[in-house]
Every structure is written in C-alpha cells, then in structure tokens.
A protein has these predicted regions:
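Active-site-adjacent "subsite" loops/lids of carbohydrate-active enzymes
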Residues: 127, 189-210
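Secreted/periplasmic carbohydrate-active enzymes, especially glycoside hydrolases
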Residues: 1-184, 206-211
C-alpha cells in the first residue's frame, strides 16, 4: 500500500510504500529489484525509487518498505482532487519488466481533533450520503458511466463523502471517488442484519477480521 505523511506545515510529504511480492511456485528464484515511479498529471516524472536486489527462495512473500521525501507536492482535496500516477515495476537484474502495477494517488493528511475532521490542516465539514451499488435497470452491475453520473449528482449537491452501505464497492468505484474528490466510508463485507446470529458466533471472528 501507499501512504503520504505531510509535515507540520502541510507542505512537504513523505511518500511511504509497503509492497508485498508473492511467489507461488518452487521454481529456482532469480534476483529481482523493485522500481517505483511517480508521475504528475502532465506525465512528467516526479521521482523514482529503486529497491536493493532481492530474491524469494521458496513459496512465500517478500516485504519491501520504501520512502521518499516529496517537496511541496500538489495536495488532494475534495474541491481540487489532484492525482498523481504511481507505477511499481518488478524487474529482473537485466532491466526486463516481469510484472507491473499502476495506480493513481493523492497527497493528503486527515486528522480527527476532538470531534472535528481536518484535511491537510484545514477544518472540513463532512457532508455524506449512503450509496448502494445498484441501479433500476442494471441491478448490481453498475457501469463506469453510471457511477460517474451518481458522483456528479453528489457533487452538484455539495456532498464530499459517501458511505458504501452495506458492502465494499468495486475498485473502479473507489478510483472514481478519488477523481471526483469524495471521501469513502467503505463498509466491510460483514452484512448480516437479516441473520444476526452469525455475528455472535466466535467461529466467524477471523472471517470478519479478514474483510
């Protein structure tokens, strides 16, 4: 995962990454390295990080922790949801790309002081609405266009947050929420109010935690 930690003046930020690389076979391992690139919205490279060489000898995973100070990045807010592009590439030692993941992310810091919510050091009133992943014609198979239309309506009515009642949404929903400047109260997939006895059974504890 990726996290951002702004300094006391909410100017510069530490970009922090914790990356798990999993190996599923007993094949002989070779040396790899992880390359991380951060791009702005003009496709200009902001920074690049490279891990030390590593290998995974058997089935299992390797955890890598990387960080870099980013000077005065553009901040994400609900009114100006600026997003960077982060690409992580798993490379062999000759530079060949074995695998890659790309995502968009924003630099922001959220805090709760007393009973107040702050974004990047600024007091923010949270205006939230419940949202179900359902449509009168499409059912639960909501398309990207439908989700965008929902978010456009929410923004027109000055909402800056949405609660995914009562289950986690698809990843595209979360990606678009970042794009539109919406905080997401993402509910875990433990909906059981129709049969509440499930939540009282200890054997379901670990399943609940995993979700």
């Amino acid at each position: 995962y990726v996290a951002t930690d702004l300094d006391d003046t909410y100017t510069d930020a530490d970009l922090k990454l914790q990356v798990d690389i999993k190996k599923y076979t007993e094949e002989v391992s070779i040396d790899y390295r992880l390359k991380v690139q951060l791009w702005d919205d003009r496709k200009e490279l902001v920074t690049e990080l490279n891990s030390d060489p590593f290998k995974i000898e058997s089935i299992g995973k390797k955890r890598l922790d990387l960080s870099r100070l980013i000077k005065n990045p553009k901040k994400w807010t609900s009114e100006t949801p600026y997003l960077y592009t982060l690409k992580m590439s798993l490379l062999t030692m000759d530079g060949a790309e074995h695998d890659a993941i790309e995502t968009r992310m924003g630099f922001k810091e959220t805090e709760i002081r007393g009973e107040a919510f702050y974004l990047n050091g600024v007091l923010l009133k949270v205006n939230a609405q419940n949202s179900h992943m359902q449509h009168p014609e499409m059912g639960h198979a909501m398309t990207e266009d439908i989700i965008r239309k929902d978010f456009e309506i929410l923004k027109q009515f000055n909402f800056n947050a949405v609660r995914t009642s009562h289950y986690p949404p698809v990843n595209k929903y979360l990606e678009l929420a970042d794009e539109y400047g919406l905080f997401v109260i993402d509910e875990a997939g433990v909906e059981a109010h129709a049969t509440e006895f499930v939540s009282k059974k200890p054997e379901f504890t670990e399943m609940y935690k995993e979700r």
